[in-house]
């Protein structure tokens, strides 16, 4: 009788399984051995995709940031902003009664998306606190956010990365 065909091990499968493990058992339970056991492979199989555990942790953080930014981009594109904020941000001249630009609305919406992602993946909270956005993929995701905001009439400035990091850590 032929052996069942094993699915090919890919970076995406490893990261998805690792995030599931972190969600179910916590970050401290993640090891190459425990991940290998879940996937039915040896520890050595991971070194094709990640040079070490630190790179695996960066990849998991990247995946959580991706989920957050994709949720945020979806809300911006559909106009489904945080219910506590104004329904639709508009770019207008500030007045005494309305000094805020859409920045506050976007930041609240981003914070809401991040909180929603972390509620879905509570084991990743500590990981994000110790792995701020820094990889090329993470910065590419952030660039997509800035491009989308610009398409909607908001021009991000050089301080935006610091602001996004501040909201993320808060």
Locations of the language-model features?
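Hydrophobic alpha-helical connector segments
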Residues: 70-137, 156-160, 164-167
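Phosphate/oxyanion-binding loops and surfaces in catalytic or ligand/nucleic-acid-binding neighborhoods
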Residues: 63, 67, 152, 170
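Short, charged helix-capping/linker segments at alpha-helix termini
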Residues: 28, 151-157
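Key DNA-contact positions within bacterial/archaeal DNA-binding proteins
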Residues: 44
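Basic, helix-initiating cap at the start of DNA-binding domains
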Residues: 1-34, 38-41, 51-55
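Alpha-helical structural segments
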Residues: 12-20, 24-25, 55-75, 105-113, ...
């Amino acid at each position: 009788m032929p052996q069942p065909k094993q699915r090919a091990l890919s970076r995406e499968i490893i990261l998805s399984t690792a995030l599931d493990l972190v969600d179910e058992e916590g970050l401290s339970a993640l090891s190459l051995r425990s991940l290998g056991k879940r996937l039915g492979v040896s520890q050595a199989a991971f070194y094709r995709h990640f040079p070490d555990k630190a790179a695996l942790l960066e990849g998991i953080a990247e995946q959580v940031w991706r989920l957050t930014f994709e949720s945020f981009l979806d809300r911006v594109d559909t106009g489904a902003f945080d219910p506590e904020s104004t329904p639709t941000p508009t770019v207008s001249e500030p007045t005494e009664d309305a000094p805020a630009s859409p920045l506050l609305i976007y930041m609240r919406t981003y914070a809401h998306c991040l909180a929603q992602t972390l509620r879905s993946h509570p084991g990743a909270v500590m990981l994000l606190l110790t792995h701020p956005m820094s990889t090329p993929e993470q910065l590419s995701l952030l660039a997509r956010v800035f491009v989308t905001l610009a398409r909607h009439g908001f021009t991000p400035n050089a301080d935006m990365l610091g602001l996004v990091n501040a909201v993320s850590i808060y």
